[in-house]
């Protein structure tokens, strides 16, 4: 086994504990107000939120440029830690929407028109997608103290900011309260406005932060789980197609449902990767030589090398070329996703839809059996990874799972301008916040 992978397995190895409460299902041990979470023995994680860019509507040349920049971002991931890219689909909170968008009444004789305008906005919000898509990068590392972890994350923050800026996206650190809000909104869907957490007050009273975010109940069955009044299921990508189009992630997350899709990335140092591929290539060449020797012993001197051995040799050489001449890196990847629904029937229908999308792309998704709790903690943006269904990928093949789709314009106290053609979400713009005030969108 590759040294990097065996080290990560050793570090991730923890004593198995059966959770005795809902709080114990959440794999966070300690939180700090700046957003760093301790998620295991000497394991720290930090989440960054990044904005979407107009990838789906870009020209072919622009798409290639964005794709190459995204490859550079993947190459910049540190070998000493693991990275998780998460796409979070959540329903628009009606209370927050009304607070941010609707015009408040002034009692000046014009409230009739304000009411009509507000009703129009509410109608549009109901007919539109009404889903908000948020994107996160969670970086986790093994450090002895929180000070060492802070130094490491400060360096990672600088690198991520520069790479996302080149892509035309903005990257920002998620603080402790905002990260707990993300988890609360997933665990307690429909109760988003009820979240309130003050870390200082919680410390003073000796309360656990988990009490503020956890659902009422957790019931894990063979192939689904119950979370309060909602049902959920975790899927993972079992088999990958030889060629995957770059719109696969966009199609999977286009569902009008609450879901989280995560891609765990473990980069391997190039020298280790080259040694591993050389070993594999040497093994293939040895098999071919032994096969030819057997044929010669049978006086068959014109035998053609079998197709499978020839294919193994060709693929090993291609992989070696990618690593040595095309500046790509070897990475291990896992794609997991969790989706929730209000009923078991709706959950089964949604699962079938997702499996169909996978089959359409010649990929096979599977439901995790008896691993729903581990799968849930892997798909959530904690930074933990409990599923080991790794796939060896190069930077180029991993970059196909590009998380970008289209940029939504949603300014607080903005004016309704129409509907986004791709995402079907409302365009709410405040011209004072735009780069150019003429409002060309």
Specify the residue positions occupied by each region the protein language model found.
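Extended, folded cores of ATP/NTP-driven motor/assembly subunits in large transport
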Residues: 1-406
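Active-site-adjacent "gating/activation" loops or surface patches in catalytic cores
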Residues: 404-441
